[in-house]
Amino acid sequence: MPAVTTTLTPKPKQSILDWISNHWFAAFLIVYGVWVWLPFLAPILMKLGLTTAGNITYFIYSFFCHQLPERSLFFFGEKTMYPLAEIQAAWQDTSNPMILRKFVGNEAMGWKIAWSDRMISFYTSIWLFAFAWWPLRRKLKPVSWWVFALLLLPMIVDGSTHALSDLAGIGLGFRDTNQWLVALTNNALSPAFYAGDALGSFNSWARLISGLLAGLGIVWLAFPYIYQSQGLNQQLNQLNYGVVLEQIKNKNPRAAG
């Protein structure tokens, strides 16, 4: 009986899912980057007169952020942030957060970013820390769970106390005056530091720092694990393909490569 010659076929082409799996970090930077940076375009669109596109952006991101204007950053206006009293004077004299959040700005005050200051700190820090992690990926091990919890704790405490404070009404709660901090520090700092949400205030610093720490914790825990698992999956795929080729060769010594 003549020998049967088997031609080994090349490794099949990658599917889209395989490509994403092998290039997951680039896919993350692009997809998450578009999602996290798009809110910064909202005030630019409004300034350019593209109000429909700008309002659509605000609407989409309203599902991911409270967008309260007194806790948001503004572009193209007199100030970067405005106190609640100025927002109420320009919009409506109300403490209803569902009404306040609809104020996106005007020509004089500028236009707010579709993220609040906390979300800017949290969401963008994940993207930035991920970018910084990549060159260190082979050396940096996942952070321990207790350190991860400690990094999340400031944002949990700050966010939950703000939520409780807002139950008394926007601008009326204990996190709006921070009298507890005045007593704790013996009123050693300026009134502008204790009260309100302006840049440089305690509330502003708390949201900025807690968001950065939470973003650092998420990247430091999740990304090393993802990198390790993706590396193992790629090695497993190569091993499986190599085993199949070896089995074919063993069954047919005259197989042509």
Question: Could you say what each language-model-derived stretch is?
Answer:
Residues 19, 135-143:
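Membrane-interface helix-boundary motifs at transmembrane edges
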Residues 8-21:
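Cytosolic juxtamembrane amphipathic/interface segments immediately preceding
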Residues 124-129, 210-225:
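Hydrophobic cores of alpha-helical transmembrane segments in multi-pass inner/ER membrane proteins
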Residues 113-133:
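Hydrophobic alpha-helical transmembrane segments
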Residues 22-52:
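N-terminal signal-anchor transmembrane alpha helix
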Residues 230-255:
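Short, highly charged, low-complexity non-transmembrane loops/tails of multi-pass membrane proteins
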Residues 47-115, 171-199:
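Extracytosolic (periplasmic/ER-lumenal) interhelical loops and adjacent juxtamembrane/interface segments
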Residues 31-42, 125-129, 143-166:
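Small-polar-interrupted transmembrane alpha-helices in polytopic inner-membrane proteins
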